């Protein structure tokens, strides 16, 4: 039994994972009296899989969540023990901030934050039913018979709906290792005639740190100049560490191949589809048989933790085989397994039954966020939680809904992909999914989204003040640069490599040349030297991308204009250079008749559509 002061809320959030935390926080910031229902209060902020936040595409989502005043970015920075900027050698648009997190510190940061959220009541219990009257949601009931009411309900059930854990041929019920699954709620959703499917994900065995031969391994240190997730973070909060790097080898692969029949997936126990971009070690050995090794990152789970997460060897093989293949790997010859790897199957709802507010079209007031919508990853879940939580609050308050467009955010790309295309496998965010990715950079997430959050009164005074100060610094920087006008001859005399065309250029236009830095321009205008490093970096990025963004917008418009273009029945997809094997196989199988049909294929990206369009035009020119 549980006891609460109030039985009526504006919003009820079911589930306390990354989506649930973000949804509850967002609803409260929007002024809604909110109940967060979770099986165990102590599990708020638990990282069920790998102890890391961010990555390619994912890091953009975290920065956008933070720009909207969300929780994840600050928690990631409070617990970050190894910062890495992925794709560092590439342009800012496709760089991905990532941090290794201390599990305990992350959980503590989340719980500390949630304890101080006004209008929030956290309830321990298991929801058995969503109460619906005349197709409209009005609350939830619990397995003990009690109920609470609300105009909006957000379901963020993760992998708990009819969750089944597989370790070899052994199966057990569970929402994750050591946690019960949700059966009654899953049955209720099925009874509502929602389009329910099954997906799977997996996790590797956890290893004892003291049993690893660290001296035999390569090491990957943290970046010297970390890229933080929150725009409020000014310094590293935790001691930084290195991760170990090792590799599988032919002997490892032999052990796995010889025992494929004992794998839950290859032994026939699992029919559902797993994440393509996070395959199990069995999948890697089978699908990439030509590879003699696969990289493994040995990620400490915390500064004081004795557990190591071997990223790259998730599995559903039995424990004895896991031990054998782990011991075949350099540095892990005597490693102890603290928790076996496993696969988990769970129910999800086809997200095409949702609108772009993540609300069920046929059940006003019922919102879904996270893995229940067919996604994978903490970041994707948190982003959906933000969208669902805000819109659940606005629904309860009879306010206008908030939608995110593809043009302004990765959050918009994520939601649009889910509700228009659906999923056939767990969905993961990549920069290639965004046609406007040159302008949707991690560095400018606040410039794109914080004004929206400010208009909705979702921000703290600290965040509003920080953003205002940043924009004032940028404005002053642009004023200084635009007031400076020089000829190409003057620029060359100052050592700048620009076109010798006699054209006069502003300082901002000079900065667009890749080889020109603000320090070069400062030779002509001393005031430029007074611009702080963070502002200088932002000005440089924006100057570099200005021309490319205009071209990107033209390409996106052209792609939209040509959606009706026919694709020949015998179109040679195999000869389209740059097309991923995944999409090539899907296109050959489905043979879409127009670009519009091709765009609706699960996993299709704007970049891939552009490649197909270019090939169509090339083929037409050759046959003319």
From Swiss-Prot:
Cofactor: FAD
Chain residues that bind NAD(+): 274-288
Residues reported in the UniProt entry to bind FAD: 15-20
GO cellular component, one term: cytosol
Gene Ontology BP terms: tRNA methylation; tRNA wobble uridine modification
Stretches assigned to coiled coil: none
GO molecular function terms noted in the UniProt entry: flavin adenine dinucleotide binding
Keywords: Cytoplasm, FAD, Flavoprotein, NAD, tRNA processing
Compartments, as annotated in UniProt: Cytoplasm
Gene3D superfamilies, per database record: FAD/NAD(P)-binding domain (3.50.50.60), GidA associated domain, C-terminal subdomain (1.10.150.570), tRNA uridine 5-carboxymethylaminomethyl modification enzyme MnmG/GidA (1.10.10.1800)
UniProt entry tagged with the keyword ATP-binding: no
Main location (coarse class): cytoplasm
Pfam family, one: SAM_GIDA_C
SUPFAM superfamilies, A to Z: FAD/NAD(P)-binding domain
Cysteines engaged in disulfide bonds, as pairs: none
Keyword NAD in record: yes
SUBUNIT field: Homodimer. Heterotetramer of two MnmE and two MnmG subunits.
Family: Belongs to the MnmG family.
Function description: NAD-binding protein involved in the addition of a carboxymethylaminomethyl (cmnm) group at the wobble position (U34) of certain tRNAs, forming tRNA-cmnm(5)s(2)U34.
Matches recorded under NCBIfam families: mnmG_gidA
Designated name of the protein: tRNA uridine 5-carboxymethylaminomethyl modification enzyme MnmG
UniProt organism field: Jannaschia sp. (strain CCS1)
């Amino acid at each position: 039994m549980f006891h609460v002061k109030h039985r009526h809320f504006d919003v009820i959030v079911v589930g306390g994972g990354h989506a649930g935390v973000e949804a509850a926080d967002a609803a409260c910031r929007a002024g809604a009296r909110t109940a967060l229902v979770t099986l165990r209060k102590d599990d708020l902020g638990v990282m069920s899989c790998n102890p890391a936040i961010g990555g390619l595409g994912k890091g953009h989502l975290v920065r956008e969540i933070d720009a909207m005043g969300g929780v994840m970015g600050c928690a990631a920075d409070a617990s970050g023990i190894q910062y890495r900027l992925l794709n560092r050698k590439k342009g800012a648009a496709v760089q991905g901030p990532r941090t290794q997190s201390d599990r305990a510190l992350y959980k503590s940061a989340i719980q500390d934050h949630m304890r101080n959220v006004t209008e929030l009541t956290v309830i321990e219990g298991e929801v058995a039913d969503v109460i619906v009257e005349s197709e409209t949601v009005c609350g939830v009931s619990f397995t003990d018979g009690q109920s609470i009411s609300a105009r909006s309900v957000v379901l963020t059930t993760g992998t708990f709906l009819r969750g089944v854990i597989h370790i070899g041929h052994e199966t057990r019920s569970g929402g994750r290792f050591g946690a019960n699954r949700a059966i009654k709620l899953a049955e209720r959703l099925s009874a509502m005639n929602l389009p329910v499917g099954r997906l799977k994900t997996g996790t590797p065995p956890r290893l004892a740190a003291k049993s690893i031969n660290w001296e035999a391994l390569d090491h990957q240190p943290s970046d010297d100049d970390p890229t933080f997730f929150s725009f409020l973070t000014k310094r590293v909060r935790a001691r930084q560490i290195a991760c170990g790097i090792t590799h599988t080898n032919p002997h490892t692969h032999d052990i796995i191949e010889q025992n494929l029949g004992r794998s839950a997936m290859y032994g026939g126990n699992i029919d559902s589809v797993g994440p393509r971009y996070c395959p199990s070690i069995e999948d890697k050995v089978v699908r990439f048989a030509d590879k003699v090794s696969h990289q493994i990152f040995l990620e400490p789970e915390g500064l004081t933790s004795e557990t190591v997460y071997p990223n790259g060897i998730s599995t559903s093989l039995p424990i004895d085989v896991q031990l054998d293949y782990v011991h075949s790997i350099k540095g892990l010859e005597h490693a102890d397994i603290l928790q076996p790897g496993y696969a988990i199957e769970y129910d999800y709802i086809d997200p095409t039954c949702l609108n772009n507010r993540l609300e069920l079209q046929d059940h006003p007031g019922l919102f879904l966020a996270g893995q229940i919508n067919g996604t994978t990853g903490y970041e994707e879940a948190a982003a959906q939680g933000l969208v669902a939580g805000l819109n659940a609050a606005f629904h309860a308050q009879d306010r206008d809904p908030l939608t995110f467009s593809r043009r302004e955010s990765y959050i918009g790309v994520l939601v649009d992909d889910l509700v228009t295309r659906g999923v056939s496998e767990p969905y993961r965010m990549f920069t290639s999914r965004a046609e406007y990715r040159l302008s949707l950079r991690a560095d400018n997430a606040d410039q794109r989204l914080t004004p929206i959050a400010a208009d909705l009164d979702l921000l703290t005074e600290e965040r509003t003040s920080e953003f205002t100060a940043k924009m004032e610094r940028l404005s002053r920087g642009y004023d200084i640069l635009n007031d400076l006008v020089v000829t190409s001859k003057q620029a060359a005399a100052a050592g700048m490599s620009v076109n010798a065309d006699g054209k006069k250029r502003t300082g901002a236009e000079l900065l667009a040349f890749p080889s020109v830095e603000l320090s070069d321009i400062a030779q002509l205008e001393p005031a430029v030297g007074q611009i702080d490093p963070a502002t200088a970096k932002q000005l440089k990025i924006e100057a570099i991308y200005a021309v490319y963004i205009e071209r990107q917008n033209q390409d996106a418009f052209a792609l939209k204009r040509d959606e009706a273009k026919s694709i020949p029945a015998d179109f040679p997809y195999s000869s389209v250079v740059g097309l991923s094997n995944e999409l090539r196989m899907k296109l050959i199988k489905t043979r879409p008749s127009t670009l519009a049909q091709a765009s609706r294929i699960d996993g299709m990206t704007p970049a891939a559509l552009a490649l197909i369009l270019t090939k169509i035009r090339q083929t037409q020119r050759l046959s003319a």
